[in-house]
Swiss-Prot record:
Organism: Mycobacterium bovis (strain ATCC BAA-935 / AF2122/97)
Protein name, UniProt field: Uncharacterized protein Mb2915
Pfam family, one: Peptidase_M23
CDD domains (alphabetical): M23_peptidase
Signal peptide start and end residues: 1-36
Keywords tagged on the record: Signal
Highest taxon of source: Bacteria
Matching InterPro entries: Cell_wall_metabolism_enzyme, Dup_hybrid_motif, Peptidase_M23
Molecular-function GO terms, alphabetical: metalloendopeptidase activity
């Protein structure tokens, strides 16, 4: 029995949709990570240094904590910009020499104690030497320590994050995530982020972006990573039936 024109049309539409879903999956799993990794951070000391003190998030923000990592170095060692940015501070802060950089997407990184070799307003990139490491960081057990910090937002209301979670050497993959209201719970006990480059790659793969903000912010809570979403969110169909997002693996 011959199929009616309506049924033939429906079957054709289904085939086209199936191919579209396959293309979406390949672009999501293949292209997006490569673009995202291009904008992740590099080590500010070379070769990659020993981490002598880890990040310890304060909760809430005004409580004591360690809002960065301490990296072992030597006095006078060159300190590099961790990525493309603009210098927003270079000088003394509370008697300590500090350099602060603003990266695309709202991320800021800070470096201390560093005697600046750059000026405010100067654009820098990963190969740029921004200053020389000085001795005297409190609690440092090495000849000198670089305190490297990272934060989202302005200093007055900054959300401090572990800069080690932003390094290019940290592999990232796409995985389906469980959702509870407007909070995504990640299985890994480390920070997770979506930066502007990753956001652009995901948008190219058919995702929707918040009109106000394209960044997930992560924080460790009870062994889970909880990424609170901005208004709107990135969403994409998955075989697990949940949204897909970035996380460390």
């Amino acid at each position: 029995m011959a199929k009616s024109p309506a049924r033939r049309c429906t079957a054709k539409v289904r085939r086209v949709l199936s191919r579209s879903v396959l293309i979406l999956c390949w672009s999501l799993l293949g292209a997006a990570p490569a673009h995202a990794d291009d904008s992740r951070l590099g080590w500010p000391l070379r070769p990659p240094p020993a981490v002598v003190r880890q990040f310890d998030a304060a909760s809430p923000n005004w409580n004591p904590g360690h809002r960065g990592v301490d990296l072992a170095g030597r006095p006078g060692q060159p300190v590099y910009a961790a990525g493309s940015a603009t210098v927003v501070f270079a000088g003394l802060l509370a008697g300590r020499p500090v350099v602060s950089l603003a990266h695309p997407g709202g991320l800021r990184t800070s470096y201390e104690p560093v005697v600046a070799q750059v000026r405010v307003g100067q654009p820098v990139s990963a190969p740029t030497v921004i200053g020389a490491l000085a001795a005297g960081h409190p609690g440092c057990q090495a000849a000198a320590c670089l305190h490297w910090g990272a934060m989202w937002g302005p200093a007055s209301g900054a959300n401090y994050v572990d800069p080690l979670g932003l390094l290019k050497s940290t592999p990232i993959r796409l995985k389906p995530l469980s959702s509870e209201g407007r909070t995504l719970h990640y299985r890994q006990a480390e920070p997770v982020f979506v930066n502007e480059a990753a956001a652009g790659a995901l948008a190219g793969a058919g995702h929707r972006k918040s009109p106000k903000q394209g960044v997930f912010r992560g924080a460790a809570q009870g062994g889970d990573i909880v990424a609170r979403q901005p208004p709107g969110r990135w969403v994409c169909p998955s075989s697990a039936g949940g949204p897909i997002g970035w996380h460390r693996q």
